[in-house]
């Protein structure tokens, strides 16, 4: 497995090298503050501590981040010594095990978490649709990182202009 530590993935009958972009987004502004590129076989939860800036009070994530706060490398306090709350979406199968009233409360809670997480998904949408980054042309993590390091600030500019009405 050479091309700079990309994992080998099969799509249909074609074998390709896969990479994954992990990034942190500010929950208030919706702008990207950190970026890591790994091979595709690295799980999301292993990159949690690298994506935190130290200013966070609450960390939101999808069900791929379940158990992030229990890991050995987990950051439990921010730079100011305040405990970080991890608000991770549950899997739907976990919600089905609850009573009817418990399901109602859990779904409401999950909806609130998902509404914050939508800012992360919006950044993905901008990168994929506005900048047409669906398939990479480069092999190697360093080249992927360089390309994404160029695209994410552009996405930040686009999103900042739309959210805050900044004129350039």
What are these model-derived regions, one by one?
Residues 53, 57-58, 63-142, 146:
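Helix-centered, glycine/charged polyanion-binding patches within enzymatic domains
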Residues 1-76, 82, 149, 154:
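Polybasic low-complexity intrinsically disordered regions
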Residues 37, 138-140, 165-168:
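Composition- and surface-driven signal marking solvent-exposed, interaction-prone regions
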């Amino acid at each position: 497995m050479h091309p700079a530590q990309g994992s080998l993935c099969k799509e249909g009958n074609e074998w390709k090298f896969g990479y994954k972009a992990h990034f942190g987004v500010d929950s208030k502004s919706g702008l990207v503050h950190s970026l890591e590129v790994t091979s595709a076989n690295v799980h999301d939860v292993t990159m949690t501590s690298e994506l935190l800036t130290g200013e966070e009070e609450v960390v939101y994530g999808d069900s791929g981040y379940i158990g992030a706060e229990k890991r050995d490398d987990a950051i439990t306090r921010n730079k100011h010594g305040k405990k970080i709350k991890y608000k991770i979406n549950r899997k739907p199968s976990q919600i089905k095990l609850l009573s009817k009233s418990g399901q109602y409360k859990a779904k409401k809670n999950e909806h609130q978490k998902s509404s914050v997480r939508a800012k992360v998904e919006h950044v993905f949408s901008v990168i994929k649709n506005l900048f047409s980054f669906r398939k990479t042309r480069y092999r190697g993590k360093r080249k992927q990182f360089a390309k994404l390091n160029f695209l994410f600030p552009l996405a930040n500019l686009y999103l900042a202009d739309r959210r805050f009405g900044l004129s350039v």
